């Protein structure tokens, strides 16, 4: 088990991996559907969602279906029906799951481990409990000061014992002072 603060760096600035993945997908969908000129001046996530749901039409619905069919978990949900807004939320979650898995794999390559896959070659890694932790405002950051955390659970295979020992004792990623990056390891079986 691992609670981590996954971040991505763009143009020298660190961004929350989850929020970045969602924003990237929404921007891509708006661009693919040629709706960029319809965006309001304040381009928050809710504005993208509203625009896509109101003006995306059948092309948007079809694109969400394509995104969801790639992931077995969400393809199963797709068979249950649901509203277009549900499909958008599932597509965002599928995108986040994929992004977090890539982040975790990248950490493992650097730190001597990899997630174990099942018989269908799907990772046994699960993520849950995404949270935003607000910190008291210092330095003029206002209410945006804080960090996010995600809990990972799954099976690992150690690929480099020395690197893994270092990760086990030092931790993974950022926000270790806030309890992130600490591995809880148990023997399988």
Mark where each language-model region is.
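RNA-interacting cores
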Residues: 1-189
């Amino acid at each position: 088990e691992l609670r981590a603060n996954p971040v991505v760096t763009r143009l020298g600035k660190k961004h929350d991996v989850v929020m970045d993945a969602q924003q990237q997908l929404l921007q891509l969908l708006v661009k693919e559907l040629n709706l960029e000129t319809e965006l309001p001046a304040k381009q928050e996530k809710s504005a993208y969602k509203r625009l896509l749901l109101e003006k995306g039409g059948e092309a948007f619905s079809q694109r969400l279906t394509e995104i969801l069919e790639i992931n077995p978990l969400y393809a199963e949900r797709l068979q249950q029906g649901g509203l277009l807004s549900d499909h958008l939320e599932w597509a965002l979650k599928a995108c986040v799951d994929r992004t977090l898995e890539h982040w975790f794999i990248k950490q493992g390559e650097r730190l001597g481990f990899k997630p174990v896959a099942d018989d269908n070659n799907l990772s046994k890694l699960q993520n849950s409990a995404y949270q935003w932790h607000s910190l008291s405002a210092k330095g003029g950051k206002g209410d945006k000061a804080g960090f996010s955390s995600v809990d990972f659970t799954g099976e690992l295979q150690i690929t480099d014992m020395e690197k893994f020992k270092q990760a086990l004792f030092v931790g993974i990623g950022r926000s270790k002072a806030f309890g992130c990056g600490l591995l809880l390891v148990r023997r399988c079986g």
